[in-house]
Amino acid sequence: MLSSITVRTKSGRLIPLVLAATLLAACSGRVSTTPPAPVQSEATASADYYLQQMQQSSDDSKADWQLLAIRALLREGKLPQAADLLGQLPSQLSEAQQLEQRLVSAELEIARHAPQQAQAILTKLDVAQLSQAQQLRYYQAVIAAAQGKTTLAQIRAYIALQPLLTQEKQRKANIDATWAALSTLTPADLNGMVINANEDILRGWLDLLRLYQDNRQDPALLKAAIKDWQTRYPNNPAATLLPSALDNILHLQSASTASIALLLPLNGQAKVFSDAIEAGFNAAKNGAFSQNSAPTAAAATDNGAPASSGTLAAATTPSAPADVNAAGAVSPSAQGTDAAAPAAPNDSAALPPLDAAGDPIAPSVSPGNPDAHIQVYDTSSQPLPALLSQAQQAGASLVVGPLLKNNVDQLNTLSTPLNILALNQPEQVQNHPNICYFALSPEDEARDAARHIWAQGKRTPLLLIPRSPLGDRVAKAFATEWQSLGGGSVLQQTFGSSAELRSTINGGTGIRLTGQPVSIAPAQPASVTIAGLTIPAPVQPPVASGGGVDAVYIIATPAEITLIKPMIDLANGTHNGIGLYASSRSYQAGAGPDFRLEMEGVQFSDIPLLAGSDPAILQQAPAQYRNDYSLMRLYAMGADAWTLANHFAQLRQIPGFQVQGATGTLSANDNCVIQRKLPWLQYQKGSIVPVQ
């Protein structure tokens, strides 16, 4: 109860002391209108507001407003001003201000793309002394400082961040981001991780990743494993809020292949391609490719082909069809003249493909279904929208095709409920939930070569390419993939006709490994997000390759590489440590021992069917395709189109899902562009052996 003590005025009136105190407080409140600075809370106002408050504040709170202004400047992308203001902070700061100074310093270093400096600052911060809002920023800074490289510190930051998020949408996004980071780890990475005994949440995440990697090739087993995991780890946030990628798997429904519309050009120059694709597709549908056995060693004949190939080794290949890529058709990577029949490497068994752990990938055999209804539609006779409408009305559940690039480009503007496996790829791929793209092209092979050469530790490649549109396309594809892997600029050197190459030989100069950088459009820079603030990254010029060339990727026919390889040796020596790589365009299976000895050390790629993965299936192919490299590749593409159609839902919804096909180990990227990992072979002492 308030005291009844009063003050008597001259007029005799009584004024309560409480009222007097209230009036005094009101008067004193007019002295300063600056509110206290919430330095440990969120900074949601503009930098101008905080700077104004800083100017009007007393010495006690001025540093608080200064720190808030720095955060606002970072949010607004004004890095120089933020750095200047950070440098103007007084040397005498309170403990709370010192913590905020270190945290905002780390955020500034991240915005400057100096992650190592940011990490050094963050490791000195005591998280327990931070407010909840500061802890949220701290863990987001740890994640951003990882620069997309998955580390234990980054994963722990995601886990610690989860309970600090208040909105369902934020929690879901963080779980998806946690899973995306974990998904980049290989089984070898997992086996090398050491965690603390009390890290139950982290252990649950790692176990979830293991069961995903072990079972993703079988959706039914994966579904059962996920449900069992949810029972074993009920306290893990992902147990009740699964990552979107895994939740999609639980609700996965396989695409029906009971009725398929096959869209191909049945007239004109591309008809020969279509015939080979359709033949391979029907062969797989009827079970020819589901009867294959494990790869076996093949005894070598005198000319390097396996004895199991019978008379194929002696058969000559007719001239391949013209490259009509300019007209929009698929462009198989094959030599155009003097090619021999396919053959397996000799002196060694053809190796099965391996996963990231080094274990063999089981073939993803799609059993034949002779009763499946296949309706072929001619894209050269009617517009694509009309054909898709007809296919839908006829009850098609899935479309395979179109083949020509101009038709594939139209898919971006069409709306159809049908699932589509396009047999080519547009220049600019757009992500459509019902479309996947499967292309067999020199560009696709060049991207695989970039990944292979990078994996072998090479960092300064040179491309030796023909002076033609083909060479330009291959160079762009290789360089784009190379830079996406983290490499610098790629050099290119072009050559002309065989006559030009012979004149170079006559000059005795050889081929020196120099060139000009491949020009490609720069990728959009990634932005940096810290505490919900997105800071655009500046455009960075490509990193120049340092040092001498350590790898050469050659796009040449057998006749051309016969001239090129000796000229490289002439100018650079044969024991120079430079890796030589060639595309399937140069593979001459029927070449004699002289050619194989001349190519000593050269690595080259080709599709598994032509690299000897299953000679029995090769024997079953129609003769007109067995004896022509380019058509045989398209025949294999048709067979893989059947397999991919049967795994359409898995490719769209299970990241990392792989299919072992006749054209390579097939997987899909985020836009469902089918990527091929090819087997690599090497000429060694007159034999052809798998690259270990």
From Swiss-Prot:
Signal peptide: 1-26
Residues covalently joined to lipid (N-palmitoyl cysteine): 27
Compartments, as annotated in UniProt: Cell outer membrane
One record GO biological process: regulation of cell shape
GO annotation, cellular component aspect: periplasmic side of cell outer membrane
Biased composition (Low complexity): 332-363
Domain of life according to the entry: Bacteria
Keyword Cell membrane: no
Chain residues carrying a lipid of type S-diacylglycerol cysteine: 27
UniProt xrefs under PANTHER family: PENICILLIN-BINDING PROTEIN ACTIVATOR LPOA (PTHR38038:SF1)
Subunit description: Interacts with PBP1a.
Name of this protein: Penicillin-binding protein activator LpoA
